């Protein structure tokens, strides 16, 4: 896919959701669409960045816009409802994952992309089942349904999946599992892409000629940047 240039941390807990859309060579359209999501980021944070650093790359964009991410049932949003607004264009209730206020599934950007034969993927510092990335890959009445979200992801048509959260993909009998059943979702992932669970295999996998890859590098969210030997920038650049 070869697409990511750089993703800089705005604050701890940045989630970087990526939508990859390949276009035919020689036209005037972008080769890919890349969506960077800063946890809790808004206009005030951009302004603070300008005050601290002066001109920022964001200002170089020829077109800019605003998206409201408040929820349908509350002025104060949270990750699930906000990500649903970004992933589907619809407002929903707090805690809902890409379902309407009536709990009907809402079509996501990734689903539209797949209909067009495009490749899609996410690279996150959280668990891949966390509310923000989940809104692009799954549908759930409540963000706490991470075991069900993991199952939807495992049987989805995702091409790249990098982050944490392997504990939701292994049977309950496996030490560290957060599932309550004996489903082995890693096996489902392995049936269609290479899967790695440890940092020591990360470098080789990122440099291999893999068109698809699942790297679940932690049982939950990834360690803090200071506590790991790889960066979000490296992960996204290799996606």
Located regions from the model:
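Soluble metallo-hydrolase cores and metallopeptidase-like ectodomains found primarily
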Residues: 212-216, 220-238
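Bacterial N-terminal signal peptides
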Residues: 12-22
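N-terminal catalytic scaffold of extracellular/periplasmic and nuclease hydrolases
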Residues: 27-206, 211, 225, 230
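Glycine/proline-rich, flexible active-site/cofactor-binding loop segments
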Residues: 7, 198-199, 236-239
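Bacterial N-terminal signal peptides that target proteins for export
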Residues: 2-13
């Amino acid at each position: 896919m070869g697409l990511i240039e750089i993703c800089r941390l705005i604050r701890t807990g940045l989630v970087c959701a990526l939508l990859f859309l390949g276009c035919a060579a020689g036209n005037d359209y972008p080769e890919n669409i890349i969506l960077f999501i800063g946890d809790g980021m808004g206009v005030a944070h951009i302004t603070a960045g300008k005050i601290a650093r002066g001109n920022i790359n964001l200002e170089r964009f020829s077109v800019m816009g605003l998206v409201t991410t408040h929820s349908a049932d509350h002025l104060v949003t949270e990750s699930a409802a906000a990500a649903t607004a970004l992933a589907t264009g619809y407002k929903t209730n707090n805690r809902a994952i890409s379902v309407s206020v009536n709990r009907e599934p809402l079509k996501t950007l990734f689903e539209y992309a797949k209909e067009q034969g495009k490749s899609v993927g996410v690279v996150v510092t959280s668990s891949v089942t966390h509310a923000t990335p989940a809104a692009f890959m799954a549908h759930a009445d409540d963000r706490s349904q991470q075991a069900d979200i993991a199952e939807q992801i495992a049987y989805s048509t995702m091409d790249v999946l990098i982050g944490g959260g392997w504990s939701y993909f292994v049977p309950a009998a496996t030490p560290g599992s957060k599932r309550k059943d004996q489903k082995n979702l890693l096996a489902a992932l392995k049936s269609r892409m290479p899967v790695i669970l440890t940092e020591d295999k990360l470098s080789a996998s990122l440099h291999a000629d893999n068109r698809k890859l699942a790297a679940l590098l932690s049982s939950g969210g990834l360690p803090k940047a200071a506590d790991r030997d790889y960066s979000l920038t490296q992960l996204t650049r290799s996606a």
